[in-house]
Regions:
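Short, low-complexity, Lys/Arg-enriched N-terminal segments of secretory-pathway carbohydrate enzymes
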Residues: 1-3
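Alpha-helical transmembrane segments in eukaryotic/viral proteins
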Residues: 8-41
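Beta-rich carbohydrate-recognition and catalytic domains
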Residues: 44-226, 230-275, 280-341, 351-399, ...
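A short, acidic, amphipathic alpha-helical segment used as a generic capping/interface helix at domain edges
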Residues: 343-344, 399-408
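Solvent-exposed helix/loop surface patches that form functional interfaces
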Residues: 348
Length: 470
């Protein structure tokens, strides 16, 4: 065989091997497609298949990577169904940590909003933290002067519970310097109050769209709860105040369906003062524990029926739960009248447990520092001083602030009762600390069947920030 013949032979063999290799690849691809097709994914690789089972309360999310399937069970909720929320509050022995956002610590180097008045509310599939921003970020020049309550820059925004109030995950809800929000099982409803003090307007959003408005009727800082409103079988209830903060004001209960007001009633409470109610559903009614900013160091109680009839009075317990307040030993308690003769106050909460009450309060009697929750035997119906349980959440060496209530719906927990939960705001900056700004973070606790040890889940940010040193 001469050299030319050798070259031709070697070339022919090489070409044959290349063709054979190509054929093997084609056959391999055909077999792979046929096998995956028979596996029930309609020939789609790297895809996501969502199978919905009406007979269960889940969605099965199957992500397929070639021949590997990852199954993730997602909560399922039919958006055509209202939440019931007529169940009783679960009887609990203590409160366990649910979430903590650490917003101010993160905000020293992250894009975190300057906020106040955070609160939590839940849908059938998630809980969200709502908060009133100041239209500025921590450690930025626009944070200067944010101790002010009402400005045109304040907005209601929300994140999933536990997330910091950061720029990247926050969702806009409403323009507001006072607000409430709740979910009826279908969509979120928010109420955001904004505008001048004498002519403020509350704009109701349902599913993110403005649906109704409430104009100030007394011309003196229309305001609302700063915590979750309450939805029962599709109807949502909340309380508003219009009038002075240090003497008799006017109070109204509102009822809305799909974001449109379907009823309202004035609350007759001469000699009493109601602000910033913390409300929750219990046995088919709305129970609210509020703030008396006029004279009382005991908290007003408002119980609302679906027909908007109501019962109003004060938390009976023989222990005061507002701040500032006097000594426990000197307080007698009353179910009908303000007691303690101390002006000012702070937003707080309580939960009825039969005839007992869980009541939260600052540990300090004079300032917003520390936080504890007490169970007082027969404290909902009698002027009892008997503490059967006490749990410390923030020690008295650290700042606290507002606190409020919400519940975990049965659709979320699978229980046959509503889990009581509360949040504690931890205010940092002005007026207590040497900064140019005021903001807060929060700790969230939920009721459990066990006693929980005392600890301090305080804010923990090291101040001042760089912006405060300029």
């Amino acid at each position: 065989m001469n050299p030319n013949q050798k070259i031709i032979t070697i070339g022919s063999i090489s070409l044959g091997l290349v063709v054979f290799n190509i054929l093997l690849h084609v056959v391999s691809i055909i077999i792979t497609v046929l096998v995956l097709g028979k596996g029930g994914n309609n020939g789609v690789c790297n895809g996501t298949i969502v199978r919905e089972y009406n007979e269960t309360v889940r969605i099965e999310k199957v992500t397929q990577w070639h021949n590997t399937s990852v199954v993730e069970y997602l909560p399922y909720w039919n958006e055509g169904t209202y939440m019931n929320n007529t169940e009783a509050i679960c009887d609990v022995k203590g409160f366990a940590p649910f979430s903590k956002d650490n917003g101010i610590r993160i905000g020293s180097r992250g894009h975190v909003f300057v906020i106040r008045e955070p609160f939590v509310s839940c849908s059938p599939i998630e809980c969200r933290t709502f908060f009133l921003t100041q239209g500025s970020l921590l450690n930025d020049k626009h944070s200067n002067g944010t101790v002010k309550d009402r400005s045109p820059f304040r907005t209601l925004m929300s994140v999933e519970v536990g997330q910091s109030p950061n720029v990247y995950q926050a969702r806009f809800e409403a323009v507001a310097w006072s607000a409430t929000a709740c979910h009826d099982g279908k969509k979120w409803m928010t109420v955001g109050v904004t505008g001048p003090d004498s002519k403020a307007v509350a704009v109701i959003h349902y599913g993110g769209v403005p649906t109704d408005v409430i104009n100030s009727w007394a011309g003196d800082i229309l305001r609302t709860q700063e915590s979750s409103c309450t939805c029962i079988q599709g109807d949502c209830y909340w309380v508003m105040t219009d009038g002075p903060a240090n003497r008799q004001a006017q109070y109204r209960i509102y009822k809305a369906k799909q974001g449109r007001i379907v009823g309202q009633t004035d609350v007759n409470f001469n000699g009493g003062h109601i602000e910033e109610c913390s409300c929750y559903p219990n046995d088919g009614k709305v129970e609210c524990v509020c703030r008396d900013n006029w004279t009382g160091t005991n908290r007003p109680v408002l119980v609302i029926s679906p027909d908007l009839s109501y019962r109003v009075g004060y938390l009976c317990a023989g222990l005061p739960s507002d701040t500032p307040r006097g000594e426990d030993a000197q307080f007698t308690g009353s179910c009908t009248s303000p007691m303690g003769n101390q002006g000012y106050g702070v937003k707080g909460f309580g939960f009825r447990q039969g005839t007992d009450v869980w009541m939260g309060r600052t540990i300090s009697r004079t300032s917003r520092s520390g936080f504890e929750i007490l169970r007082v035997k027969n404290g909902w119906t009698q002027t009892s001083k008997e503490q059967v349980r006490k749990q410390i959440v923030v020690d008295n060496l650290n700042w606290s602030g507002y606190s409020g209530s919400f519940t975990l719906p049965v659709e979320l927990t699978g229980k046959d009762c509503l889990v009581p939960c509360f949040w504690v705001e931890m205010i940092r900056g002005k007026p207590e600390e040497k900064t140019i700004w005021t903001s807060s973070s929060s700790i969230v606790m939920c009721g459990v069947d066990y006693e929980v040890a005392d600890w301090s889940w305080h804010d923990g940010a090291i101040l001042p920030f760089d912006i405060d040193k300029m």
